C-alpha cells in the first residue's frame, strides 16, 4: 500500500510539473510544482481569450493575440508593445519588448551598447577597444529575440508566446526578476500573422468533422508557405524585411530562440547542437554558443523529467536561409517540439515511433537521444509545456551568463573586422550588370558595407563607374562571403555508401542565382575616395504585354513553388497578370477560351493527378485534377495553348501525354545520382525564342529534378497511341523532330557550380529544358526551377519567354 501511495505521489508531482502554466489563483502561477507570486492587475491570457493557451481544440485569432499583448502592456511596466509594420495582406506585425522597468526606460542606451560591440571599429583605435568594450559589457544586457509562429500549422509557439509574456510580466519570483534585470527580451508572437487566421479559420471550420486537424488546402503564407523560413538572405518577403530591418539590425541579439514544431512520430523535442556540416562562414564562437546553450537546455529538461529529447541530429547549420543570426553575431537556438493534429490531441503508440533519417532512433536511448518516451497521448498542452520550459531555461542561461554572452558577441565582431590574411580573398568587386542592383540590395539589407569608388583599377583591370566594392574585413563580411563564393558541400555518406540527405539544400551562392559576375580580390585594396552610391532604381508600375492570358495551376494540396511563381509574377516591376485555376476549375475544360498559357509549378506527378485521397479531406478538395483535368489540358494544347511545366511537374506531362522524352535519372539510386538543391551549369540554344537574349551559358537550380533525353523512334509509338484514343480531336504524331532542346548540361565538364552533385557523368550532354510541339500548341518542360524561391533571376528570362510570346521583361 505504501509503495502504491508513493507511486501515485510521484505521478501527481510529474503531472503538476507538466501543467506549468495552469493558473491557481489571482496572484499565483504554478511552475514545476510551486506557486509563484504574481503582481496584481496583470491580465492572464485566459482573461482575454476565454481559455488557457494550450487547451485542447482552442486557437486564438490574430486580433485576439494582438489584443492580449496590448492589454498586457497597458497593465505592466515590464512590457512595451509596438507595431513594426504590416504583413503581406495587411495585418499588424508586432513585437513585445520585455525587461525590468528601469531597463525599458533606457532602451536607447542599450541599443547603443549593442551597436558598439557589434562593430568594434566604432570604439576607436585597436589599442583601446578592449578596455572600452569591457566597460560596455559590464553595463550591457543580454539581448534575446524569441520568434514564434513562422510556420502557422505549428500553433504551439504563437500560443506559448502569451504564456511566456504573462509570466515575465507578472511573476515576482526571484529567478524571473533576475531574467528581467539581466536581459532584454524581444518577443515576436508570430513571424507570419496572416497564417494564424488561415489556420484557425480552417481548423474551426473542420472542428467536429472527420477532417478535424488537417492542414488548410492553401498556403499559410500568401506566397511562400513553409518557405517563409528560407528567406533570411534574399529578403524577398515583407515579414523577413521587417524582422531584419527593425529587430535584428537594430538590436543585434546575442541569442535568437526560434520556436517550431516537427512531426509527431519522432523525438518530443530537438535542441542544438546541430548535426554536421556547419557552413564555413559561421564563426567558431557561434558554434560554441549554440552547443553550450542547447546542451544546457536539454540537460536541465531531462533533469526535470521531460522525455524524448534529441540533440545533434536532423537539423544542420549549413544555410543562411534559415539562420540570419549566425552571420550577425547571435546564436540561433532552434527548438522543434513534436506536433499533435493542430490543436487536436493524438495517441502515438511506441511501435509507431519512426527512426530519424539522421542521428537517432526514438525507440533507443543514445548519445543524441533520451530518455525514452514510451508513447501515449500527446496534447497541445504537452507542446506548450515543452516550449515554455525550454524558453525559460534559455532565458535563465542568458541571465546567469550575461557577461559571457556579451564577451562572445564582442569577440565575433572583433575577429570580423580584423584584416584578412595575405593571399586570401579580402574583397569582392561587383561590376554594374543586369540584376547587380538586386544583389547589392540583398547584401545591404544584411548589413553589408558597400563602397562605390567611381572608376578604379585593380589587378590591371579597369572597373567602371557604378562598380561596387565589398571588403570582407567588416562586421558582416562573412555574410557577404557566404553569398558571393561557391559552396562545396562535403560528401557525407552512411555506412552503406548512401549520401546523407541535407536538411534543406546545399547551395546559396546568390550571385550565381542572379547571374551577376563577381570578382574576388586577393591583393590589398587602395581605392579612390568613395563616391555617392548610384541610384538603383525601384519597382515601377504594373505593366504587361500582349498575350497575357495566363493561368497558374493551384492544387488543393498546396505547392510552395506555386506561391513563389505568383510572387515572381506579381511583385516585380513587370507584374505579369495571371489567374489561379484550381482542380475543380480545370476539370470543367474549355481552357483555351480564357488562356494562352497554363503554368504547372513544381509538384510531384502523383499529387498533381490524384491530390488528396478520398476521406482525408472534404470531398471538394480531393482527387487532384484527375483524368478530366488531363483531358482539358490536352485539348488546350492541341488547340494552340502553351503548357509550361516546372521541375517535377514535367514528369506529370511526360507520363500523361506520353511525350517522346524520358527522365534518365528517374529510377537511379541516390548512390549513383544525387543533387539535393544545387546550382548547375547549362548551355543554351540561343536561336530558340525562349532563350533569346540570353548568354550561351547559364545556371539552373536543380533539386529533385528530371533530366531529359529524347526517345529514339518515338513517332511510331505516339502514332499508335493516338489511333487508340477515342476523342473528337486526334493527337498528331510527335516525331523526334518536333522536340526542341533549348538547354542541356555540358558534355565536356562537370556541371556543378555550387553545392553537391554525385554521378555527374549521368547528365553530361543531357537536356534540361525542352519544347514539345503538339497539334497547334506546345509543352515546355523545365528540368529545373527557373524562379527558385524568388532568387534565380538569372533564369527568369527563360520562364518569362515561355509564358509571353513577345515579352522581354526589364530585369536590370
Predicted feature descriptions by range:
Residues 1-9:
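Bacterial N-terminal signal peptides that target proteins for export
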Residues 199-211:
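Aromatic- and acidic-residue-enriched segments that line the glycan-binding/catalytic groove
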Residues 193-198:
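Secretory-pathway/luminal and periplasmic proteins that interact with or process carbohydrate-rich
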Residues 8-19:
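Bacterial N-terminal signal peptides
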Residues 12, 714-723, 728-730:
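Intrinsic, low-complexity polybasic segments
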Residues 23-184, 224, 230-231, 236-238, ...:
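Intrinsic-disorder/low-complexity accessory segments
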Residues 259-262:
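Short acidic/histidine-rich active-site segments
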Amino acid at each position: 500500500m505504501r509503495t502504491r501511495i508513493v507511486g501515485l505521489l510521484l505521478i501527481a508531482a510529474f503531472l503538476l510539473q507538466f501543467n506549468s502554466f495552469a493558473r491557481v489563483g489571482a496572484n499565483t502561477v504554478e511552475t514545476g510544482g510551486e506557486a509563484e507570486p504574481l503582481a496584481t492587475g496583470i491580465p492572464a491570457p485566459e482573461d482575454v481569450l476565454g481559455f488557457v493557451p494550450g487547451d485542447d481544440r482552442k486557437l486564438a485569432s490574430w486580433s485576439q493575440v494582438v489584443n492580449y499583448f496590448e492589454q498586457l502592456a497597458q497593465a505592466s511596466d515590464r512590457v512595451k508593445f509596438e507595431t513594426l509594420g504590416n504583413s503581406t495582406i495587411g495585418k499588424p506585425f508586432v513585437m513585445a519588448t520585455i525587461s525590468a522597468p528601469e531597463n525599458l526606460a533606457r532602451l536607447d542606451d542599450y541599443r547603443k551598447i549593442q551597436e558598439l560591440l557589434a562593430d568594434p571599429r566604432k570604439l576607436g583605435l585597436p589599442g583601446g577597444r578592449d578596455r572600452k568594450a569591457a566597460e560596455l559589457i559590464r553595463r550591457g544586457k543580454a539581448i534575446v529575440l524569441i520568434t514564434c509562429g513562422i510556420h502557422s500549422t505549428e500553433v504551439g509557439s504563437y500560443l506559448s508566446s502569451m504564456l511566456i509574456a504573462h509570466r515575465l510580466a507578472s511573476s515576482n519570483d526571484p529567478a524571473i526578476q533576475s531574467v528581467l534585470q539581466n536581459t532584454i527580451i524581444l518577443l515576436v508572437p508570430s513571424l507570419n500573422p496572416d497564417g494564424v487566421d488561415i489556420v484557425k479559420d480552417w481548423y474551426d471550420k473542420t472542428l467536429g468533422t472527420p477532417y478535424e486537424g488537417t492542414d488548410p488546402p492553401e498556403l499559410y503564407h500568401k506566397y511562400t508557405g513553409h518557405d517563409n523560413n528560407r528567406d533570411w538572405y534574399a529578403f524577398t518577403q515583407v515579414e523577413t524585411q521587417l524582422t531584419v530591418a527593425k529587430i535584428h539590425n537594430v538590436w543585434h541579439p546575442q541569442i535568437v530562440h526560434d520556436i517550431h514544431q516537427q512531426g509527431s512520430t519522432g523525438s518530443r523535442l530537438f535542441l542544438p547542437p546541430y548535426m554536421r556540416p556547419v557552413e564555413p562562414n559561421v564563426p567558431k564562437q557561434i558554434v560554441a554558443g549554440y552547443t553550450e546553450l542547447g546542451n544546457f537546455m536539454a540537460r536541465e529538461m531531462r533533469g526535470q523529467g521531460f522525455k524524448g529529447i534529441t540533440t545533434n541530429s536532423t537539423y544542420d547549420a549549413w544555410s543562411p536561409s534559415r539562420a540570419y543570426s549566425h552571420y550577425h553575431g547571435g546564436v540561433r537556438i532552434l527548438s522543434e517540439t513534436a506536433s499533435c493534429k493542430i490543436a487536436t490531441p493524438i495517441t502515438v503508440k511506441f511501435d509507431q515511433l519512426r527512426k530519424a533519417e539522421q542521428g537517432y532512433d526514438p525507440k533507443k536511448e543514445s548519445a543524441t537521444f533520451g530518455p525514452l518516451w514510451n508513447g501515449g497521448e500527446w496534447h497541445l498542452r504537452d507542446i506548450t509545456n515543452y516550449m515554455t520550459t525550454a524558453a525559460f531555461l534559455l532565458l535563465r542561461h542568458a541571465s546567469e551568463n550575461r557577461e559571457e554572452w556579451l564577451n562572445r558577441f564582442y569577440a565575433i565582431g572583433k575577429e570580423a573586422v580584423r584584416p584578412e590574411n595575405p593571399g586570401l580573398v579580402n574583397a569582392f568587386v561587383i561590376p554594374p550588370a543586369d540584376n547587380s542592383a538586386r544583389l547589392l540590395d540583398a547584401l545591404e539589407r544584411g548589413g553589408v558595407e558597400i563602397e562605390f569608388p567611381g572608376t578604379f583599377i585593380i589587378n590591371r583591370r579597369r572597373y567602371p563607374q557604378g562598380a561596387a566594392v565589398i571588403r570582407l574585413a567588416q562586421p558582416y563580411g562573412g555574410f557577404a562571403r557566404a553569398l558571393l563564393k561557391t559552396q562545396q558541400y562535403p560528401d557525407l555518406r552512411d555506412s552503406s555508401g548512401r549520401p546523407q540527405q541535407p536538411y534543406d539544400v546545399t547551395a546559396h551562392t546568390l550571385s550565381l542565382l542572379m547571374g551577376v559576375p563577381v570578382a574576388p580580390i586577393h591583393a590589398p585594396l587602395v581605392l579612390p575616395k568613395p563616391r555617392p552610391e548610384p541610384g538603383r532604381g525601384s519597382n515601377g508600375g504594373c505593366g504587361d504585354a500582349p498575350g497575357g492570358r495566363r493561368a497558374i495551376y493551384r492544387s488543393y494540396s498546396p505547392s510552395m513553388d506555386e506561391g513563389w511563381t505568383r510572387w515572381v509574377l506579381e511583385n516585380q516591376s513587370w507584374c505579369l497578370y495571371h489567374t489561379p485555376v484550381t482542380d475543380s476549375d480545370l476539370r470543367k475544360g474549355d481552357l483555351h477560351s480564357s488562356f494562352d498559357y497554363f503554368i504547372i509549378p513544381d509538384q510531384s506527378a502523383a499529387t498533381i493527378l490524384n491530390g488528396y485521397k478520398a476521406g482525408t479531406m472534404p470531398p471538394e478538395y480531393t482527387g487532384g485534377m484527375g483524368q478530366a483535368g488531363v483531358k482539358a489540358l490536352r485539348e488546350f494544347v492541341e488547340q494552340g495553348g502553351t503548357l509550361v511545366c516546372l521541375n517535377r511537374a514535367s514528369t506529370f506531362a511526360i507520363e500523361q501525354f506520353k511525350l517522346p522524352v524520358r527522365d534518365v535519372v528517374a529510377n537511379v539510386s541516390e548512390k549513383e545520382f544525387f543533387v539535393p538543391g544545387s546550382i548547375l551549369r547549362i548551355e543554351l540554344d540561343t536561336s530558340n525564342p525562349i532563350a533569346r537574349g540570353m548568354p550561351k551559358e547559364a545556371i539552373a537550380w536543380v533539386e529533385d529534378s528530371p533530366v531529359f533525353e529524347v526517345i529514339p523512334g518515338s513517332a511510331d509509338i505516339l502514332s499508335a497511341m493516338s489511333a487508340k484514343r477515342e476523342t473528337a480531336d486526334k493527337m498528331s504524331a510527335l516525331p523526334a523532330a518536333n522536340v526542341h532542346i533549348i538547354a542541356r548540361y555540358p558534355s565536356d565538364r562537370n556541371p556543378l557550380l555550387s553545392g553537391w552533385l554525385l554521378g555527374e557523368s549521368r547528365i553530361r550532354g543531357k537536356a534540361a529544358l525542352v519544347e514539345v510541339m503538339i497539334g497547334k500548341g506546345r509543352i515546355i518542360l523545365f528540368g529545373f526551377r527557373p524562379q527558385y524561391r524568388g532568387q534565380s533571376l538569372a533564369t527568369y528570362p527563360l520562364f518569362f519567354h515561355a509564358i509571353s510570346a513577345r515579352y522581354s521583361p526589364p530585369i536590370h
